[in-house]
Amino acid sequence: MENSSLMKVAVYSTHKFEKEYLEKAFSGKHDVKYISSPLTLETASLADGNEAVSIFVSDNASAPVLQILSKIGVKFLVLRSAGYNHVDLAEAKKLNIKVARVPEYSPYAVAEHTVALMLALIEN
């Protein structure tokens, strides 16, 4: 959907299993660019023209990457994870990039995943 009034968001490390849910959540609210590659020094420029970037826990949000994002106009960094140790928060603050994350995971989802892993181990 191309609408100049919608915030443009680049979503890095997009997995097939989450794209359906992201599309539902963003529908009519944001102009989304899905990028299957992780955020790195080499891929940061793919976010050019986007005001926000969404990343996963394995993406690189170090100071050099954040500097590139800032230079191309990124103002928001949204984490699709509770952990944020891969983000240079001091640099983000210095560059005036707002950072948001998932506050916590559902304890039910964690328990279900644990049981699924145990069943997979038993099967093998």
Describe every region a protein language model picked out:
Residues 51-124:
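Phosphate/diphosphate ligand-binding glycine-rich loop within oxidoreductases
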